């Protein structure tokens, strides 16, 4: 049994806190800014950008071409979702040693970029639909053209 406030603080500190990690910088601020500039120079082919545009707009419920979105989605992705897929695709391409964004990069980033950017309606919840399965289905209908 702890005999004093100091003893109790010592016990709590030793048993409820992790070890203090030693963190040392790997890159500095100017290097990060340079990396951001490099990422933005990676080209995106017109057909890849068009796919991102179609995918983003296909999440909008007012899009009459996509009955899935109008049935289950209350709010679709904003332009930020498209920006995230493009910039993420550029980073992914560089990390893979490529100098251009592929449709595969966009498909790999689609769920992390868009799942939290679409709001489902009550019908989707009642039917057990999730953002991930709806996005996969929407992307499947778009194909990769």
Task: Give the label of every model feature segment.
Residues 61-145:
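C-terminal engagement/docking regions of AAA+ P-loop ATPases
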Residues 1-69, 95-99, 103, 124, ...:
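Conserved C-terminal "switch" segment of AAA+ ATPases
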């Amino acid at each position: 049994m702890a005999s004093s406030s100091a003893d109790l603080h010592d016990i709590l500190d030793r048993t409820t806190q992790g070890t203090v990690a030693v963190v040392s910088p790997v890159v500095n601020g100017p290097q990060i800014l340079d990396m951001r500039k490099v990422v933005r120079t990676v080209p995106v082919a017109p057909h890849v950008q068009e796919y991102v545009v179609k995918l983003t707009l296909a999440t909008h419920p007012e899009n009459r071409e996509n009955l899935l979105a109008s049935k289950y989605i209350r709010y679709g992705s904003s332009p930020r979702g498209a920006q995230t897929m493009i910039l993420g695709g550029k980073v992914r391409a560089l990390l893979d040693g490529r100098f251009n964004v592929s449709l595969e990069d966009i498909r790999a980033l689609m769920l992390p970029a868009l799942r939290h950017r679409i709001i489902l309606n009550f019908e989707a919840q009642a039917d057990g639909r999730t953002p991930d399965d709806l996005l996969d289905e929407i992307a499947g209908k778009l194909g990769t053209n």
